[in-house]
Structure formats: structure tokens, C-alpha cells
């Protein structure tokens, strides 16, 4: 399956975005769910990953421009010292790539409370560069 990404400059960085809600959902189910499954295999005690895996399939998504300051990282995840250390290292590497013009995906945000579900490294770099608004795939409860 291929996806029809568009490349858009926004703020100081270039994003590779999907606009079609069905395509966004397919992309997230294929790639983000796989990433979370691997995370869960490595750290089954991390309850936030389980919660995200449970709600993702039932959500509908849209590409939105939102205020970066409105996004809330998961407090439990951010309290893990090893995660904080690795996040800073990954953010340093990602920052260099972004400054060299490498595009980034929109952040993945739960529209109910604006919890950051995916994109902690990108979020960290975007905060460093005081981006006011960012692209995000915002998820809301789907139709059951």
C-alpha cells in the first residue's frame, strides 16, 4: 500500500502530510500500531501503550493545524527517566535532520484532551524552536 503524501512547509519545518481521513487511518493502523506493538512487547507494563492500542482502531482522524502549547504529553510516560534520556538523544538527532530539510510527519493527538499519542521526538524539537502551530492528525471517537 502506498500513500499520497504532500510536502508542506509550515513554520520552520517541512511536513509530509496526508489529507484524506481514510488514508490517514490506514497509515496509522499500518505503521503506528506496529510501532506500539513492538513497544508493548519490550515494555508490557507501560499502560499508556495498551490504552492507545485499544482506542486507535475506533478513532477517526483529520489533518489539523493546532497550537503546540495545547498538546499534552502523557505524564506517566514523561516521568520515566530512561525515556526522558533517550528522548533528548533522539531529539538531538532529529533536530539535525530537520534543520537539513528532512520532512516530518504530523504529530498524533487524541482530540479528547489533546494528549500526544505519537511524535514525542518531533514534539520536543518543535518546542525547542518555539513553533506556535503545528500539523497534527487529530483523532476523535468514530462511529460504532
Language-model regions, residue ranges each:
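Surface-exposed, charge/polar-rich loops and edge strands
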Residues: 2-62, 68-85, 132-144
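Glycine-centered loop/turn positions within well-structured domains
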Residues: 105, 123, 132
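A structural signal for short coil/turn segments at secondary-structure junctions
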Residues: 102, 129-130
Amino acid at each position: 500500500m502506498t500513500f499520497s503524501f504532500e510536502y508542506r512547509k509550515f513554520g520552520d519545518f517541512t511536513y509530509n502530510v496526508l489529507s484524506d481521513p481514510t488514508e490517514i487511518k490506514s497509515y496509522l493502523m499500518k505503521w503506528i500500531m506496529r510501532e506500539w506493538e513492538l513497544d508493548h512487547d519490550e515494555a508490557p507494563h507501560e499502560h499508556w501503550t495498551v490504552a492507545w492500542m485499544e482506542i486507535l482502531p475506533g478513532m477517526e482522524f483529520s489533518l489539523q493545524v493546532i497550537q503546540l502549547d495545547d498538546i499534552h504529553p502523557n505524564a506517566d510516560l514523561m516521568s520515566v527517566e530512561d525515556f526522558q534520556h533517550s528522548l533528548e538523544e533522539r531529539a538531538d538527532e532529529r533536530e539535525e535532520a530537520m534543520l537539513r530539510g528532512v520532512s516530518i510527519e504530523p504529530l498524533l493527538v487524541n482530540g479528547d484532551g489533546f494528549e500526544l499519542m505519537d511524535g514525542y521526538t518531533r514534539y520536543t524539537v518543535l518546542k525547542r524552536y518555539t513553533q506556535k502551530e503545528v500539523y497534527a492528525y487529530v483523532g476523535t471517537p468514530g462511529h460504532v
